[in-house]
Each structure stands twice: as C-alpha cells, then as structure tokens.
Amino acid sequence: MYKSIDVVRQEFLDFFHKQEHQVVPSSSLVPKNDQTLLFTNSGMNQFKDIFLGLVKPSYKRVVTAQRCMRAGGKHNDLNNVGYTECHLTFFEMLGNFSFGDYFKDDAIQFAWELLTDSNWFGLSKDKIWVTTHIEDDESYNIWVKQVGISTKRIVKIGNKNSDLYDSDNFWQMGNIGPCGPCSEIFYDFGSDLKGKPPGYMQGLGSRYIEIWNLVFMQFNRQLNDRLIDLPMLSVDTGMGLERITAILQGVHSNYLIDVFKNLIVDISNIMKVKEYINNRSLYVIADHIRACVFLIKDGVVPSNEGQGYVLRRIIRRSVRHGRKLGVNDIFLYKLVNLVIVHMNYVSNILYDQKDLIEQILFNEEKLFNNTLKKGLELLEKSLKNLNQDKILSGEIAFQLYTTYGFPLELTKDICCERNIKVDQLEFDQIMLTERRNSKRLSQFHKNFNNIILSSYAKTSTFVGYKCFSCQSKIIALLQDNELINKMCDVDQESMVILDITPFYGESGGQIGDSGYLKGECGVFKVKNTKKYGQIIVHIGVLISGIFLIGEQVFAQVNRLKRKDISVNHSSTHLLHSALLKILGSHVTQQGSLINDKYFRFDFSHYNAITITQINEVENLINQQIWDNLLVTENIMLMESARNIGAIMLLHKQYTEKVRVIQIGDCSIELCGGTHVSNTNEIGLFIITKEFGIGSGVRRIEAVTKNAALSVIQNKKKLIQNIAQIAQSDDVNLLNVIHEFKARYEKLDREIKLLNSKQEIQKVLSLVREVYYIKNVRVLVNHVKNMESSSLFKMVKLLKHYLQSGIVVLINIRKNNIAHIVISITKDLVECNRIYAIDLIQYIIRSVKNGKGGGRFDFAQLNINNVKNVSELVIQIQSLLNDIICNIKSIK
C-alpha cells in the first residue's frame, strides 16, 4: 500500500495518540546541555534526563517524530551517504516511549498492530523477522505465544565475543547506568535480493533490513557489571521514517521515496544535470542540503570545530560533488527553497530563516571556492606521484586540511573513487601533535554525574525568585568527588547541596550566584552555583568550623551582585526584542553570557551592524528603560506561551509548564533566569562591542547602570585627552584630525614614491647580475633588512624584467636570519615543471636548519644563524645548476 512520507509520519503519531500517548514536537538537532553528544541522533535524546532519573516526566506515554543527524562523533554515516541505499546524514526517527507505564507486552503488541494491521501500515506478517536477546525469554515468549510470529522468523542473539552485555540486542547508555534488552524488527524484501537472515555475522546483504528497535530499559548497570532492577521500567523505540516509507512505497532505496525523488528531480533541473536516476552525486547533494538547512535553522554555523565543523564538512562535500557534475558556480543556496517546498510540514519555521540560511551557504561556498581549485591541484599532483602501495600520506592530507580547508573525509572520498587509501594513522598523529590541548570532559564531571545517578532521588527547591536568603537543610556534602557526612577541611574546594536554596544555579547564560552558608558551627563561602538536573550545587570553600549532613544553615545570596546580574538579564530580553524589530525576524539567539559586570548576546545575522543600526537599538532600549515598563512573571502551559507569541530558544528543551517573562508590551520570552521588576532599575544601556564570531553569527557586548555611565565618562575623558594632544577644543577636534590625516597621507605618498625610485634602482642593478643555466635566466642575490612587502614587490618587478626565469632573493634580517624568496615564471612551471616549492625542499635538505613552504610558482623559507651570506648564495647557485642541468626538456 503506497503512502507518502507525510502520511506515514502522521499515521505513526495518530496510532500512538490513540493509545493515549502525548505527541511531543521534535527537539533541536543541537542537544540541550549534553556534552556527550555532538548532535541529536535518536528520539530518546530529549528524554535522556528522564531515563537517568534527573527529571520527572510530564507524561507517562510519549510519541515523537524526531529530526536526527548522524554525521559526527560515535554515530557518523557521512562517508556512506550517496554510496549506499539507506545511509543519510539527516533523517527522522519515529519513536514511542513509556516512562514507568507499559512495558514489553504492550510495546510489542503496539508495534505488531501498527506494522501489520490493514488499517495502518498493512505489511505482510510473513515478511517480518524479529531478534531478541538470548537471555530475554519474556520478550521471546510474547512474540511467539501472544503475537504468534513463527519460531522460524525469530532469532535469539547472544553477546559478541562472549563480552558481557555487548550485543546488538542489549542497549546501554554507557558503561554504567540504565540499560536493557531490545527486540529488533526486520523486513524481508524477498529472494530477488541477496542476504542472510538476521543473526548471521557475515553475508547480510540487503534482503533483510532493520526497521524498528524496541528497547526495554529495566536494569541499572553498576561499575562491577552487576545489573540491578530499575525502580521505573521504561520503553524507548526508534524507527527510521525514510526506511519504513521506502518499504510502504515498494522501493529499496531511501533516495527513491517521494520526498527524495521529487527533490532530486528539482535539484537536477536547477543544476542542469540531465541524468538524475542513480546519480550518486545528486544523492549526496539532496541529502546534504536537507542537513545543511536544518542545522543552520537550529543555530549551527560553519566553523573549525564541533558542530560547525561538521556542517562545514557537509557543505564542502556537497560543493565537491557539484563540481563532479560540472557545476562550477555557487549553487547550494539556490536549493534552500526546494527543501522548504518538499519538507512542507515544517515550511513555516524554515521560511522565516530562509534568507539567513541562503546567505550562510552562499558565503561558505564562496570561501571554499577560493581554495578548492588549488587544493585539487595539489592532490592531483600527489596522487600521480604515489608508489605502488597506493596510499596517500597523512602529511599531504593534513596539508590539504590546514592550508586548503579539505576535511579529511573529503580527501578520503576523492581517493576512494580511485581505490587509493589515506594514511589516517599518520594524519591522526600530526593532528594529535597540533592539538594536544584538545577539549575533553573533565574527570570531575564524569565522577560527579555518577554520584548524581546514584542519588538522583534527592532534589533541591529554588526559592530565589522571591528572596535572597532562607533557612535550609544540608542534604549532601561532596569533597574530592566523594560524598561525605562531615566537612571540616577549611579552604578546600567542596560542594554543598541544600533542600531549599535562594542561590540561582548557572543556566540560560546567567552565571551562578555567590554568597554564604552559615550554620551553627561553620561558615561556607559559595563561589559559584551550578545546576545538575533538579539538583542545585553550591561550590566553594569552608572558611571556618564544620558542616554536617542534616544540619540547618542560613543561605544568603550576594544581594548586590544578584541585582546587577538581574539588570543585565532583563537587558538581554530588551536587546533581543530590539534586534528583531530593527534587523528583521530572521534574528535568533545563538548564545549568551550574563554576569554582574556586562553581558554578551550572540545572534544570527549575516552582515555587520551599522553604526546607525546600533544607535537605533540603543535609543529604542533606553526609551523602554525610561518608560518604567513593568516586568512580570507568569507560569503557563507551553501551548499558551506559543499562542501569545513568546520567544523560545532553538536549542532549549521546555517542560509542559513554562515560565514567561513579559516586559511591557515589547518583549515576551520563555526564561528561567532572574529579572528586575521594572525597567527603570536598568538605568542606562550602552553597546560596547559588535563583531562576528562565525559565518552568519554576530556578537554584541553591552553594559548597563553604573558600568554604562563609566563608558560615557571614559569616552569623554579620552576625547579631552586627544583634544589636548591635538591642541584643539572638542568642537573643532574632528576637523583638526582630518587635517592631521591629510598631512600624514601626503607625507606617506612622498615616502612611498622615494622608496619606489630606490627599489627600481635596486632592481636595475640586480638585473645586471642575471646569468644563464642552459637557456634559463637565473638571478640569485641578497639584500639587507628589507620589509617583506618591499621584498615581494621587488621579486615581482624582477620577474617582470626577466619575462622568463628564476628569481632567488635572500633578505638578511637582524639576528642573522635569512629570509629566502623563490619565484618562477609561469612558462618554466608549466612547460619544464620547475617548481618553487620543490626548490625550497632541496634547500631545506641542504642547509638542514630551514623551515618554509609555498606554491608551484612562489615559495619562501627562513634559515637561522647564517654567518656567511656569500657562501649561501654560492650554495643555492650550485643547487640550481644541478637541478636545471638534469632537466632533459631544457636545452
């Protein structure tokens, strides 16, 4: 029975909605507060804290159609995309979840009914195979005795290599924590395709395809590998939307389902590619443009690390496949509208950011175009010179990566098409040397999270919205990542957890509170406050006495610091609203930092903000401050917040009930931070900096209150000091500076003219030193203490005079450092294959203490401790003589 992808998605949601599941929208592709994941890669990610016991579920039964990415980290399908029928970087995962409600029986019955009932998907029962874990007799019996599946089509799967719980049918979140057996459901495409049934380790082929995984979380794995029963049994299932759609549409490839087929046809029309059937490059581009659009929509921008680097890799892989199809113009941005049209169920949220997405893609492709051609030339040359082992060195791959922006995957992709391997071990070793300080999760966080997991029943209640102090009880003490009953070590960093606290835990960009905890026998100085799930942790040092579990303490927040933080937090809301009004609706928050000194606000926008726009923003916000607008807080249902147009952050995951902060009639935003009660408390607002931090992302830094007044006073003082130096008053200062500038520019032109005449005289004198090796004009000479720009200009002039030849200039700098520049005319490079970069390498090997690099026609290096420049000149002349004399094409 043919069903469109939109119908399949909706029927899945409708089926489980009828089974009393709450339909929860897809979360962002960027996981919220989860450093273990690069991207959301499954439906359960947004419920991870529920499975860990850190957050109580709003609903017992949930169903989602989650947008996912698998193009980085542990789950990385990027290299397979376009070359297999099922791999995608961006896809949707259909899933139903139970949090302490139904378990194996209902989960299996639900899956069977949806797949086989003629009112739903209507698949043939004889086409369905199932695997269960070898020790999960309960699931096996449900499948056989209740569902009625033939024992010929159900397989028990054991552990791999006898490793405990290492099985395709045993799911675990990590080495410790929630885990359990799973039932995997497969579809048999029939005997026309090759492949062995599920359970075989080899020769799987493509006949049997996994379509759904039902995970039953029933155990908590301990450090000693012992499994203990979880107090709350849960179900987590996942089924790829594109994969089940392919089955329902009678095709064996994700790229042949309706959404891809239509998208590929339209892409081929725009790119003017005639052959679009089984065109692997079009498959790559169709997949990648979907990934690009949704990543940028969720706030990711191209960069050199993390999520931004994955996006950059995807864009550059797309561009390279465009070049394979003969498209040399910038094209990716033209495809954005096609994604919006064909992903019409989310077209509204995409269309609002269409211009931003197109601009970011245009800028990134333009940037890559500048180096793509040169990088391909280097790669082509390197591939031609390979030995019989057909392995490209990791050094060349790293040079392509650092100099020409070729992600390693792109280099491997190109090499793979020619059956050439890349020495990834060498590449990784070079990368490791370059990045010894790469970021890793600290052992503290790992240990601390384990502690939280073992005591997740404890929670902290935050009361700091209404008060700055309260009586509290100590419910946990930590020192050296260990839970303790008594704290007596003074000045040692420690952590205190209270049942009730006025201290705000760092979140939403707002820093944590500081202050004091005072007990009967001790005083604890709180330096910072952090939030882990529902637990608020006070980090600091005991400054006197002792603290005990169960002891009553008086918790006192630093009131003045908190008030300044609240002023800045409310100001970010005013800034966000002002940017939307002045720059446009495409503006979305990308991040923030809010402390008591200043705040910064990152947002999506593709151009620098003009001084006029900055003035407009400042004027609007200051007027709102002086209008004495009320700041109100309301707790309401998420749906109600949407209906009143509250701003919601893309990366944030919200509960059923949300806190809404409204400032007059100019700002409504979901927020958990602390705020002023009236805008007049802000006093004054001034933007101090505005700059770009990535492709399509700008940052504003701003100050308020006394800090803003200090900025004005400091600028006034600076103007007065400049006026004093210029011997002018404030009124005429600008005219005086213009006069100074005009005089400077006149003197600068005269100096440059004089230098130019001297350079020409020097060039003419050097030309007289030209000699021949065979028929090649050669100039090797030296100069002293010349600026690099002047040196390069002189080399260019010498090449012009020679018309054909090799120029080598040695610039002797201070401390006896020789800066050698080699430039070769185009005819010698193309006809006789004399390369400047090769000559540099010869010199480096000869002198043994040089370092440099370059291109075919231009290269340079530095040599330390040159004591005799004349000997160096002779040495290079001799080297050139040997090289040129051995080139047979030169007579």
From Swiss-Prot:
One of its GO terms (biological process) is alanyl-tRNA aminoacylation. Zn(2+) binds at residues 569, 573, 671, 675. It catalyses: tRNA(Ala) + L-alanine + ATP = L-alanyl-tRNA(Ala) + AMP + diphosphate. Binds 1 zinc ion per subunit. Keywords: Aminoacyl-tRNA synthetase, ATP-binding, Cytoplasm, Ligase, Metal-binding, Nucleotide-binding, Protein biosynthesis, RNA-binding, tRNA-binding, Zinc. Pfam families: DHHA1 (PF02272), tRNA-synt_2c (PF01411), tRNA_SAD (PF07973). One of its GO terms (cellular component) is cytosol. Its main location: cytoplasm. Its EC number is 6.1.1.7. InterPro entries: aa-tRNA-synth_II/BPL/LPL, Ala-tRNA-lgiase_IIc, Ala-tRNA-ligase_IIc_anticod-bd, Ala-tRNA-synth_IIc_core, Ala-tRNA-synth_IIc_N, Ala-tRNA_ligase, Ala_tRNA_ligase_euk/bac, DHHA1_dom. GO terms for molecular function: alanine-tRNA ligase activity; aminoacyl-tRNA deacylase activity; ATP binding; tRNA binding; zinc ion binding. The keyword tRNA-binding applies. It is found in: Cytoplasm. Its cofactor is Zn(2+). It comes from the Bacteria. SUPFAM superfamilies: Class II aaRS and biotin synthetases, Putative anticodon-binding domain of alanyl-tRNA synthetase (AlaRS), ThrRS/AlaRS common domain, Translation proteins. It is an enzyme of class 6 (ligase). Consists of three domains; the N-terminal catalytic domain, the editing domain and the C-terminal C-Ala domain. The editing domain removes incorrectly charged amino acids, while the C-Ala domain, along with tRNA(Ala), serves as a bridge to cooperatively bring together the editing and aminoacylation centers thus stimulating deacylation of misacylated tRNAs. PANTHER family: ALANINE--TRNA LIGASE, CYTOPLASMIC (PTHR11777:SF9), ALANYL-TRNA SYNTHETASE (PTHR11777). Homotetramer. Catalyzes the attachment of alanine to tRNA(Ala) in a two-step reaction: alanine is first activated by ATP to form Ala-AMP and then transferred to the acceptor end of tRNA(Ala). Also edits incorrectly charged Ser-tRNA(Ala) and Gly-tRNA(Ala) via its editing domain. Belongs to the class-II aminoacyl-tRNA synthetase family. This is Alanine--tRNA ligase.
